[in-house]
Amino acid sequence: MFKDYPAAVELRHRSWSDDFGETLKLLNEHHAAFVQIDEPKFKTSIRQNQLPNITSFYYLRAHGRNWKKWWRHEQKDERYDYLYTAPEIGKFGETLKAVEKIVKKSYAYTNNHANAHAIVNALELKDFLRQPIHEDFNPELIKRYPELKKVLAVVPQRDVLVPAHRS
């Protein structure tokens, strides 16, 4: 039913990387991308090399690194309450630049959605990759995250934020 659609599989338990060769063989047989995840690392976490296993596409998913709240939290979104730093975003950007030489298409998904962190980090990643930002944003975003001033600019007459480097 889904054979005409690209498939990506996100595996989180270490048992999948204990026999990495067999896991890759299984994924490759089904032309499925091995989702490269960024999350806190524990003994039971999967081990990954951040390299693509197929050439059709690459999928990076950033959950955040809030290890203190990953397993023990009052609200489920607390585990994703993590704002990546500029160097961490830069590392993702460098990885994406490298894999784009190998794959036809790459995707990066920021899943650290608590407190709008996913939006902030996605904008920073797009800026790092010199990708155009066409969306407008509420000015409250830059008040809360002043580091976005280099990425977004305020247009007073419209009372929205627009990309600072609009092409």
What is the meaning of each model-derived region?
Residues M1-S167:
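Residues lining hydrophobic/aromatic ligand-binding pockets adjacent to catalytic sites
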